[in-house]
């Protein structure tokens, strides 16, 4: 089946167990797929948009209620839909950072966090990670003191990853927030890999701003995401327009400046909303998903020379492995070179690991079943033994 001239249909999740690091949490639910068909036309949610003409006030489909439910789900006061987590970072930086302001990020901050600071003409300062690839409160405090001493300014904002994209490690956001707040620095918690995957309580984390990704972790079409904040900061980050045309005298009602007015006007918002009941249920099952990924990692570690670079035992399904001393030794003489591993996995119905990777690579097992976890674990061992690697199972 083709989707149009030259566009093949995509069947990766129908034909394979997909371990792609960034795709696992964004697989659509059946309800979201129905929403894609029903609301695929451009401004499809605008059929019943009436005064004050803003997305978060639309009652049919129930987007106004969805905005309130999202805020409650995250234990924050106000939430808005945004076109991906990056637009949440951008909105907060635009509201909080002035030219020349120092801004704290971490050694594992996503590039879009840096770009949001750059666009606001702030200056980026990174908090280093420790040897375990964790951002610690002590490191944050030391970096804050250093930045204040060298710039003469208190950082305008601190970005913290709840789970980072490089190692899939959980960082002590609550403790980091306490450190930042001692210096009156507001905190943006990046929950791109957690919101929609596991329970996230923004106020318990001490987050002033909480950003999530719909298409990465909330079973939603791309680009979609959420930006939530507390009542303390809502008026600032969701400020309404005050501009006026000098010739026409036009004004623009209650459009929010950092949101650029309405954000997700069609299939993205309804797809995200359609998946939401499923998302609320699945975050309660995250512990089982962690058990499954640990089964896979345990199996990989029986292959001599294999190391896990993420914290272990795993606390999240996104995982970074180092097989330089195992699978990469095979790649040096194999006729398929580094592609032998992903080729062998694909023959077994497993996809998603970067083709050619036999040294350092990531996978994300979120959404698999217990049986699939056992199958993946056994597949890695079978491939290793077939290629002459020693396994201690």
Swiss-Prot record:
Modification N6-(pyridoxal phosphate)lysine occurs at: 216
E.C. designation(s): 2.5.1.73
Binding site for pyridoxal 5'-phosphate: 85-86, 190, 213-215
One GO MF term: Sep-tRNA:Cys-tRNA synthase activity
GO biological process: translation
Cofactor(s) the protein needs: pyridoxal 5'-phosphate
Top EC group: transferase
Catalytic activity from the UniProt record: O-phospho-L-seryl-tRNA(Cys) + hydrogen sulfide + H(+) = L-cysteinyl-tRNA(Cys) + phosphate
Keywords of the record: Protein biosynthesis, Pyridoxal phosphate, Transferase
One Pfam family here: SepSecS
Domain of life: Archaea
InterPro entries assigned to the protein according to its UniProt record, in alphabetical order: PyrdxlP-dep_Trfase (IPR015424), PyrdxlP-dep_Trfase_major (IPR015421), PyrdxlP-dep_Trfase_small (IPR015422), Sep_Cys-tRNA_synth_arc (IPR013375), SepSecS/SepCysS (IPR008829)
Similarity-based family: Belongs to the SepCysS family.
PANTHER family, alphabetized: CYSTEINE DESULFURASE (PTHR43586), O-PHOSPHO-L-SERYL-TRNA:CYS-TRNA SYNTHASE (PTHR43586:SF3)
SUBUNIT field: Homodimer. Interacts with SepRS.
Function: Converts O-phospho-L-seryl-tRNA(Cys) (Sep-tRNA(Cys)) to L-cysteinyl-tRNA(Cys) (Cys-tRNA(Cys)).
The protein's name in its UniProt record: O-phospho-L-seryl-tRNA:Cys-tRNA synthase 1
Organism: Methanospirillum hungatei JF-1 (strain ATCC 27890 / DSM 864 / NBRC 100397 / JF-1)
Top-level taxonomy: Archaea, Methanobacteriati, Methanobacteriota, Stenosarchaea group, Methanomicrobia
């Amino acid at each position: 089946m083709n989707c149009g001239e030259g566009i093949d249909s995509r069947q990766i999740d129908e034909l394979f167990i997909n371990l792609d690091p960034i795709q696992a949490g964004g697989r659509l639910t059946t309800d979201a797929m129905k929403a894609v068909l029903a609301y695929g036309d451009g401004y499809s949610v605008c059929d019943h948009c009436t005064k004050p003409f803003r997305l978060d006030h639309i009652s049919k489909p129930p987007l106004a209620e969805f905005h309130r439910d999202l805020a409650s789900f995250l234990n924050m006061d106000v939430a808005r839909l945004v076109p991906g987590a990056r637009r949440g970072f951008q909105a907060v930086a635009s509201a909080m950072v002035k030219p020349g302001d120092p801004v704290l990020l971490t050694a594992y901050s996503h590039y879009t966090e840096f770009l949001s600071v750059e666009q606001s003409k702030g200056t980026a300062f990174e908090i280093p990670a420790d040897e375990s690839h964790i951002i610690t409160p002590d490191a944050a405090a030391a970096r804050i003191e250093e930045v204040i001493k060298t710039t003469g300014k208190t950082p305008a904002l601190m970005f913290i990853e709840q789970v980072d994209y490089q190692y899939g490690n959980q960082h002590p956001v609550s403790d980091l927030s306490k450190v930042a707040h001692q210096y009156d620095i507001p905190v943006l918690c990046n929950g791109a890999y957690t919101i929609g995957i596991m329970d996230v309580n923004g106020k318990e984390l001490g987050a002033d701003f909480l950003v999530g990704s719909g298409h990465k972790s909330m079973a939603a079409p791309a680009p979609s995401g959420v930006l939530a904040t507390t009542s303390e900061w809502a008026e600032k980050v969701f400020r309404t327009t005050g501009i006026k045309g000098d010739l026409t005298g036009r004004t623009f009602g209650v459009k929010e400046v950092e949101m650029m007015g309405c954000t997700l006007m069609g299939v993205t918002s309804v797809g995200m909303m359609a998946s939401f009941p499923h998302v609320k249920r699945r975050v309660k099952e995250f512990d089982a998903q962690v058990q499954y990924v640990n089964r896979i990692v345990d199996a990989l570690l029986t292959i001599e020379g294999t190391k896990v670079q993420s914290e272990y035992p795993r606390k999240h399904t996104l995982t970074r492995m180092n097989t330089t001393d195992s699978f990469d030794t095979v790649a040096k003489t194999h006729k398929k070179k580094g592609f032998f591993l992903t080729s062998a996995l694909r023959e077994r119905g497993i996809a998603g690991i970067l083709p050619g990777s036999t040294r350092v690579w990531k996978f994300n097992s979120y959404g698999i079943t217990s049986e699939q976890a056992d199958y993946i674990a056994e597949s890695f061992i079978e491939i290793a033994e077939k290629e002459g690697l020693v396994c201690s199972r």
